[in-house]
A protein has these predicted regions:
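WD40 beta-propeller blade core
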Residues: 6, 44, 94-95, 134
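Solenoidal tandem-repeat scaffolds enriched in leucines and small polar residues
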Residues: 1-17
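Extracytoplasmic beta-rich repeat domains
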Residues: 14-31, 56-79, 105-121
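C-terminal hydrophobic structural anchor segments
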Residues: 74-98
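Short loop/turn segments that connect beta-strands within beta-propeller blades
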Residues: 9-12, 47-50, 97-101, 137
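Structural signature of WD-repeat beta-propellers
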Residues: 1-2, 38-39, 81, 88-89, ...
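Hydrophilic extracytoplasmic domains
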Residues: 88, 98-137
Length: 137
């Protein structure tokens, strides 16, 4: 997959910047930063003003890294409190420091996630492949 992430000036439609970045996830914009997850499971923080990459963090892309089998698919990120939150089809919820990109916690889920997490009312909601909805926080 190919693709770009870009910033537009809404009143004029003028393209401010663009980055080659294959993604199928929605960007999360917070303050001066755009947080984006690529199709190869790399999470990045881009400057909203310039598109410059502040940090990039590779999330685990495979369960078996030696054989490169059993792909892990991540959804997100969303900003919940002071952490970025992502979920995976490998029954994991990851929290990431938005300033440094450091993975601060991996929390097991009872089943694979099936969609991006949602942050609302001080909680993170996770839809599982079983059809259950978890409310965390």
């Amino acid at each position: 997959l190919g693709g770009i992430v870009l910033s537009l000036d809404l009143p004029t439609g003028r393209r401010l910047w663009e980055k080659d970045f294959a993604t199928d996830q929605t960007s999360w914009i917070a303050g001066d930063w755009v947080f984006q997850l690529s199709t190869d499971q790399q999470l990045a923080a881009l400057s909203a003003d310039t598109g410059q990459v502040k940090w990039a963090r590779q999330l685990p892309p495979f369960k078996n890294m030696k054989k490169l089998t059993q792909p892990i698919y991540w959804w997100g990120p969303v900003l919940a409190g002071s952490s970025l939150v992502l979920v995976s089809n490998d029954k994991q919820l990851a929290t990431v420091n938005p300033t440094t990109g450091e993975i601060t916690n991996i929390i097991p889920l009872p089943a694979p996630a099936a969609a991006p997490p949602i942050a609302a009312e001080g909680k993170v909601f996770v839809t599982l492949a079983t059809g259950d909805l978890l409310a965390l926080g």
